[in-house]
Amino acid sequence: MLKFQTVRGSLRLLAIRRTSTATAASPNVRRLEYKPIKKVMVANRGEIAIRVFRACTELGIRTVAVYSEQDTGQMHRQKADEAYLIGRGLAPVQAYLHIPDIIKVAKENNVDAVHPGYGFLSERADFAQACQDAGVRFIGPSPEVVRKMGDKVEARAIAIAAGVPVVPGTDAPITSLHEAHEFSNTYGFPIIFKAAYGGGGRGMRVVHSYEELEENYTRAYSEALAAFGNGALFVEKFIEKPRHIEVQILGDQYGNILHLYERDCSIQRRHQKVVEIAPAAHLDPQLRTRLTSDSVKLAKQVGYENAGTVEFLVDRHGKHYFIEVNSRLQVEHTVTEEITDVDLVHAQIHVAEGRSLPDLGLRQENIRINGCAIQCRVTTEDPARSFQPDTGRIEVFRSGEGMGIRLDNASAFQGAVISPHYDSLLVKVIAHGKDHPTAATKMSRALAEFRVRGVKTNIPFLQNVLNNQQFLAGTVDTQFIDENPELFQLRPAQNRAQKLLHYLGHVMVNGPTTPIPVKASPSPTDPIVPVVPIGPPPTGFRDILLREGPEGFARAVRNHEGLLLMDTTFRDAHQSLLATRVRTHDLKKISPYVAHSFNKLFSIENWGGATFDVAMRFLYECPWRRLQELRELVPNIPFQMLLRGANAVGYTNYPDNVVFKFCEVAKENGMDIFRVFDSLNYLPNLLLGMEAAGSAGGVVEAAISYTGDVSDPSRTKYSLQYYMGLAEELVRAGTHILCIKDMAGLLKPTACTMLVSSLRDRFPDLPLHIHTHDTSGAGVAAMLACAHAGADVVDVAADSMSGMTSQPSMGALVACTRGTPLDTGVPLERVFDYSEYWEGARGLYAAFDCTATMKSGNSDVYENEIPGGQYTNLHFQAHSMGLGSKFKEVKKAYVEANQMLGDLIKVTPSSKIVGDLAQFMVQNGLTRAEAEAQAEELSFPRSVVEFLQGYIGIPHGGFPEPLRSKVLKDLPRVEGRPGASLPPLDLQALEKELTERHGEEVTPEDVLSAAMYPDVFAHFKDFTATFGPLDSLNTRLFLQGPKIAEEFEVELERGKTLHIKALAISDLNRAGQRQVFFELNGQLRSILVKDTQAMKEMHFHPKALKDVKGQIGAPMPGKVIDIKVAAGAKVTKGQPLCVLSAMKMETVVTSPVEGTVRKVHVTKDMTLEGDDLILEIE
């Protein structure tokens, strides 16, 4: 660095003495007049313009910027002392190609010299000549040299004359496709088209066969014309797997030429450089000498002055071929500056002033390589979508800096808008270290520090390159990216903070994302979490299970003295009272207290049933993640889930392998006890669920769903003998525990005594578990009767979450058995604290609380037999539709519907079938008799029809006739177990499909969620990809968002806490958006949120639906430049449909399917946003 500072210091000193005459370089060097430059205009934009402005400022030179109408907000115009608009009314690129405007600005503002930067006019001889004709110096080679070097065919001829080896190719630009055919016939494939008047990858296309020739010729010509104003092409033999090595040269007006060694630019995509290295690693010294000497020789051949680059291909045998000269500064000039300590822009300006290289202290023998430098081009491109350019507003920009890191950027800042009009380069990151691995480490660290939000970037891809062993070894060629597909295994950025801000802003603008049934706000205060002792929780029944296995666990339960309790607060209680809406956030907060205080519980019911799909559908949480997190917090108490037999946790039948895999993965994630039931007590379904749970290593708890009344001799269908017979079958099948599942709360104390004592007498060694609901108000009495009759376990809920359609009170059972042989051992004072927490938590869910419409339970449940959760739902639905006064009729219809279907056992999904039929009868004003009489003409609910077809199994006593025959007519009927005929689901294929659909690592848990609920899972993944980890938000923020000026904290993980303050919401803009302002960790953040209500009244181009294969969307924002098909056209898979242009690159959109074009939604020259619908194929 000392040498670097010395050289730059000397250059600044020279700037001060601008009025003096240059000292002679040597006695034999010809003398030129020194003309100091006082004002420089950069005929370019972006980071290269700023790079030149900075150099000029260091030399005391005034700077002038030019900008297009589209660049009014770009940083380069602000970095200059003066800035002027050019190309008014022209297309974005054409503005910077408009020579008359640029010369006019230079003349009118007394500009001494023009720096062309790179790209645009930098290699146009007519521009260099126009500057010279106007009396303005061109900081670069003479117009004649620019013309010769810019014409790649002439440059090739010069190289041949200089004795520099070249690649076989045409001697002049080709003018027709026919000439390309002739060259291919002579030299064979592969060949490459190259733009004759520019580089940077534009106008380059590799062709491997005659079939590809015409399309690639057309595209290359079009790209060259758009980028350089001239579509001329030449064609060369394509050398496969070469290294791309370029040599930096520098010349003065005195004939001095020197080189600054080489750069390795082999890491390319579509012939565009991605990562550049200086010097080239593991380059043979003799090859380096040949490359540098040939470069100097070629420069001397044409009298080259100023900075330039000579590019070569080096084949695998070490033979080099000249390909072109870039008569300008290169994008990657930075790495050469870092390793040679030479400021190339300073040198360019001084040479243009008339100084000699020796004057500047630049002699070949003094140029030494110091360490290694790497440059990464951070672009707004999406590597996961073939590097398609992304556009939009940068919401967050934080760069990586530190020792050995240099950043060259332009409009890389929060609030900057990335348009589709220009190059996608965001910032150049340059790392300098003592050697290649050190520079790579510094670069990797710097990129890891970057935070860019609002647009996609290629940073994840660059990080993969930097960590690649081949790259670290330094031996790469131009096929490096193509031959390392693992580079595209991208780790998605978590981006949690910004996603959460998007969610909060969305809720603030549009309201809750989950349907809110009641207009009630969450409690403004958080529930109080009781004090938790320090240290691990005491041992519990799970420790026995882990030590002795399911059989040993069952023995321990049976041998336990006193009554055991299962707490349903984490699942069934809130399913019954709060529409299953309790979030993981609130479950986690109380979990450590439960682990420490209730270690004597038999189990905690916390998973399965409706909680699985509701978590994804309405709470936007992963149910598996809930299980994993709760397991970590409660290691000592067994977890229990509700498994719907062959239906697992869904509402339909699944292939057997899905049910088995589900149980296996649930067990791996921490589930212990599988309470297996079937809504019809259909034995084949029960046995399948039991087998799946048992094979997974879980505790099998077979559950008999209870209905009727065994204490009533007149109720003969579901008699004591029925239940005893079914119990015999389940015990014979190997259940570890037997459960009576009383989902409606129909067990009266007398019936409890009869049923439980009979089971205890028949199965003295088998643990008995009783589940009920407290709808009638007799739940506590019933559970006490069960306990006295010999039950080992009964279900309870926290006091504040008990009663009504939930389970009986935990505190009541604990108090009633205290000091008796049935003592639960649960500390009553801990129950009080637990209840207080849930009382506070329940207030957060006021919008879902059943007490909004239902004030008490009702003993009429003994007549209508409606299950607890369904009773709550039906009651609320009736009131929400203004039919609260008719709820009695709904209950009456439920009784009639049940009898009409043959008196079913009613639990999900059979209870839903009865409920659907009941509502159908009420809505149509039908009695049971009328519905049965008109059965052949009525359109019954789908669930009823499928039940009668046998899709959920066969009910006890068979299907009701003649109703079944009347309804089904000729519809097919399922014989036997419904899932038995289903072929196994290809889970590996599903995993592959999900990976393609969601573009990230898919877990076995994800696969099973998608197998159970494909549409719900897809929506959940899309939602969380947009809005992030919502379970870190407290429930009030989740439901209604923050108030303006509210400050709060969000803990993402241990040690990572966000400090957020909501600041303001803007008025509606023309795009139907509102800007929402936050303060995040002390920094201002703003996001744009679509106002969904306002947008209903505005017209926007339709978006392609990702799940509809025939809908073809724009892969990137851009302009339609060609449409290749029309409505009615037949297309094949892979056939080009249209061509988009963005950031000076063209992309051909191809058909993903075979079919017929139904409708074309775009026209030529239309500007599209990403995913805008292009056309539909059917």
From Swiss-Prot:
Its main location: mitochondrion. Substrate binds at residues 571-575, 644, 908. Residues 1-20 form a transit peptide. Mn(2+) binds at residues 572, 741, 771, 773. Residues 156-353 form the ATP-grasp domain. SUPFAM superfamilies: Aldolase, Glutathione synthetase ATP-binding domain-like, post-HMGL domain-like, PreATP-grasp domain, Rudiment single hybrid motif, Single hybrid motif. Residues 563-832 form the Pyruvate carboxyltransferase domain. Pyruvate carboxylase catalyzes a 2-step reaction, involving the ATP-dependent carboxylation of the covalently attached biotin in the first step and the transfer of the carboxyl group to pyruvate in the second. Catalyzes in a tissue specific manner, the initial reactions of glucose (liver, kidney) and lipid (adipose tissue, liver, brain) synthesis from pyruvate. The gene is PC. Homotetramer. Interacts (via the biotin carboxylation domain) with SIRT4. This is Pyruvate carboxylase, mitochondrial. Acetylation of Lys-748 might play a role in catalytic activity regulation. It catalyses: hydrogencarbonate + pyruvate + ATP = oxaloacetate + ADP + phosphate + H(+). The lineage of its organism: Eukaryota, Metazoa, Chordata, Craniata, Vertebrata. Binds 1 Mn(2+) ion per subunit. It comes from Bos taurus (Bovine). Residues 1109-1178 form the Biotinyl-binding domain.
